[in-house]
Design a protein with these regions (language model features):
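Short acidic/polar active-site loop segments enriched in Thr and Asp
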Residues: 62, 149, 175
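A mid-sequence, solvent-exposed acidic-amphipathic segment
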Residues: 109-151
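Short, hinge-like loop/turn segments at secondary-structure boundaries
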Residues: 81-85, 144, 195-196
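A C-terminal functional module that forms or caps the active site or interfaces directly
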Residues: 148-168
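Short, acidic/turn-prone active-site loops that include or flank metal/cofactor-
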Residues: 132, 158-159, 181-184
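Structured adenosyl-cofactor binding patch, chiefly the S-adenosyl-L-methionine
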Residues: 163-204
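N-terminal positively charged helical leader segments and presequences
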Residues: 1-29
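RNA substrate-binding interface of SAM-dependent RNA methyltransferases
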Residues: 30-127
Length: 204
């Protein structure tokens, strides 16, 4: 058993009666803090967002900010995925898969520009882009050199970043990088990018 964003432990059923179920718990130490990894995700279709919520939580992202960008459909932010709180269930599934209790901070109501303006500062900033990136993410020495600094990774919407988005990312100090010549689904690109990031840091 586990408490959301708290310790794990073992539960034991002590009493079962027609109107009573009594449990006892023995808690382990709280898990170690996650390495800060903020994902800025161009707001996708709800089904893609569900996959991103689950997989990013499994991979240990600490914050997921779904942002409107030049090539996004802003109506996706009105989906019942967000308005009913369904998104939380997908995060919980991702945490369960990782045998963890922690779920990330999640937002879906900001523009790319406002999300960039709210970043704390001092992070390694990487934007994935298939068209204007000068090199591959796996060859990004900046990540390797800067060790354990927090990372902000920006992944475009399903139609990619627009020119205005790229200008904003560059202005805010993002290094543009690509994942190779093939065009990937958003959820596949996210898993590949986080895996490459972990490998660059010697974590896998």
């Amino acid at each position: 058993v586990g408490l959301i964003n708290g310790p794990r432990g073992k539960g034991r059923i002590e009493v079962i009666e027609p109107d009573v179920l009594r449990l006892s718990f023995r808690w382990d130490r709280p898990p170690a803090p996650l390495e800060p990894l903020i994902l800025l995700l161009g707001l996708p279709r709800p089904q893609t967002a569900r996959d991103l919520l689950r997989e990013a939580t499994t991979l240990g992202a600490t914050a997921l900010h779904f942002v409107t960008a030049e090539r996004c459909d802003a109506n996706y932010a009105a989906s019942s995925l967000w308005s009913t709180g369904e998104w939380r269930r997908h995060c919980l599934q991702g945490a369960e898969q990782a045998f963890d209790t922690r779920i990330p901070e999640v937002s879906w109501s900001h523009s790319l520009e406002s999300a960039l303006a709210s970043l704390p500062g001092g992070e390694i900033r990487v934007g994935l882009d298939n068209y204007e990136a000068p090199g591959a993410l796996g060859a990004c020495e900046e990540i390797r050199k800067r060790g354990e600094q927090p990372v902000v990774m920006a992944l475009g919407p399903e139609r990619g970043w627009g020119e205005r988005d790229r200008t904003l990312l560059r202005r805010e100090g993002f290094l543009l990088a690509h994942l190779g010549p093939r065009v990937l689904r958003a959820e596949t690109a996210m898993v590949a990018a986080v895996s490459i990031l972990r490998a660059l840091r010697g974590q896998m």
